[in-house]
Amino acid sequence: MASPCLIAFLVFLCAIVSCCSDNPIDSCWRGDSNWGQNRMKLADCAVGFGSSTMGGKGGDFYTVTSADDNPVNPTPGTLRYGATREKTLWIIFSQNMNIKLKMPLYVAGHKTIDGRGADVHLGNGGPCLFMRKVSHVILHGLHIHGCNTSVLGDVLVSESIGVVPVHAQDGDAITMRNVTNAWIDHNSLSDCSDGLIDVTLGSTGITISNNHFFNHHKVMLLGHDDTYDDDKSMKVTVAFNQFGPNAGQRMPRARYGLVHVANNNYDPWNIYAIGGSSNPTILSEGNSFTAPNENYKKEVTKRIGCESTSACANWVWRSTRDAFSNGAYFVSSGKIEETNIYNSNEAFKVENGNAAPQLTKNAGVVA
């Protein structure tokens, strides 16, 4: 039988290993000191439901050299010109940039917008990023803040679709509608007119990872509305993100679909952390939740549209190996039928919730 001292040492060692565990996405590319010469390796590093996203891998590099914006007839060297091309492109930036778009920027499929190596800011009082009926998009290393509503106007959506009138947008940082295979990684998002990320209208195969969400009330919406049941096929991974400071609610808020929320770190929220309606499956695993000081805000979860607790009793909301501080608690419900939600290419190791602050310490844009 092991001695008490040996057991105590092993427990201590396990705690150290857990707290110092590597973030699997960052370990994939940041350990390479020559990543700048091998940028497209990043596309091999996604985990979760968006792990098949290739973005612009295998295509040409396109360098943004100008912060100018023409929504109808963009000039070569601008972000809009590269983002709307039909060809596969890996978009990088020649220098630090502050880009204020005049209309929403429609990002075509098979694109990576890679801000690494430059200090790139989008928003600044203008509208921001929009994806519709596209696949294979990676957004990495961008500061997106101050996104504002847009007006009805003409916009070049893509080379093939051309210029079309588009409705006014709400002022989200990133909007995805009917998008498949998208990966949103290592961005810093804050202070927009509406949400920071919307994933709606049948979008699926999405990973949202290593981002820093702060100074914003309604953070992340997954699912269009309670009548749009096509979102039942939605699958989203939310992993290794830092929520807060000053993040109010919707981290995320889901309608329908399957959402895996793993190894995120939550600062005190204003309303709730994780919520939903229309019977989404929400699997919370290895997160760290620190509740606000107010006693009535301690609950992590919020079920919306339930007349009584029993009305939502069969919703599958489960907490596994989460860590709770300052009185935070997760109200579980339902019974999960299938524990293996990922295939072998999507699966990743999820640490205990006590490790989440370490795993998310580099969330947001990496300097």
UniProtKB/Swiss-Prot annotation:
Q: Which positions carry the signal peptide feature in this UniProt record?
A: 1-21
EC number in record: 4.2.2.2
A Pfam family matched by this chain, by name?
Answer: Pectate_lyase_4
Classification via InterPro entries: AmbAllergen (IPR018082), Pec_lyase (IPR002022), Pectin_lyas_fold (IPR012334), Pectin_lyase_fold/virulence (IPR011050), PEL (IPR045032)
| Catalytic activity line of the entry | Eliminative cleavage of (1->4)-alpha-D-galacturonan to give oligosaccharides with 4-deoxy-alpha-D-galact-4-enuronosyl groups at their non-reducing ends
Location of the active site: 250
Task: Report the cofactor remark.
Answer: Binds 1 Ca(2+) ion.
Q: Name one GO molecular function term.
A: metal ion binding
Glycosylated residues are 148, 178
Q: Which cofactor does it need?
A: Ca(2+)
Q: Does the keyword rRNA-binding apply?
A: no
Name the positions where Ca(2+) binds: 170, 194, 198
The record's disulfide annotation reads: 28-45, 128-147, 306-312
| PANTHER family found in the cross-reference section | PECTATE LYASE 16-RELATED, PECTATE LYASE 18-RELATED
Its recorded name reads Pectate lyase 1
